[in-house]
Amino acid sequence: MEKILVMNPGSTSTKIAVYQDETPLFVESIEHSQDELKPFENIIDQYEMRKDLILATMEKNGVHKEDLTAIVSRGGLLPPIKAGAYRVNEDMVWQLTYAPQNEHASNLGAVIANAIATELDIPAYIYDAVTVDELEPLAKVTGLPEMQRKGMGHNLNMRAAAMKYAKEHNKPYSDISVIVAHLGGG
């Protein structure tokens, strides 16, 4: 049986869950107050604090890190990529730590996942990074020839909501057109 740690670091919380196969063992949102985050000059500086809180929350819920078989996190602000899953590697961690496209809490996901996974010798993945860019060429038009719109957004949440809708209506995801709004803290 697989035990997978799932993480979603956001601006005001870190949502985590551990699944045994497809069954959630626990789901928890670790809230971060402004006072708690204030000492950190850059978001990446929150790495140790958030990693420690994730591990402590797992222990509190009776899950030992040694029992994990994989880790999956929300993807951060990488260069533009296609939607889907990517195995975390050192180049990705370097990009998110030292040269992210922008400062964002999602950048912590792959960094934390990689640290825990490396220690345990298990795989770490990201899924649907913020910088998923699958826009049609026309959607990139801004009105200024020298500027193109970039495909960026809360792709993880939006694609999951659209996939859920498709499943509930017994339609292939590729055959639906839906409008999804993300209303979050970031």
Regions found by a protein language model. Give the residues of each.
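Conserved active-site "lid/cap" helical segment
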Residues: E31-V72
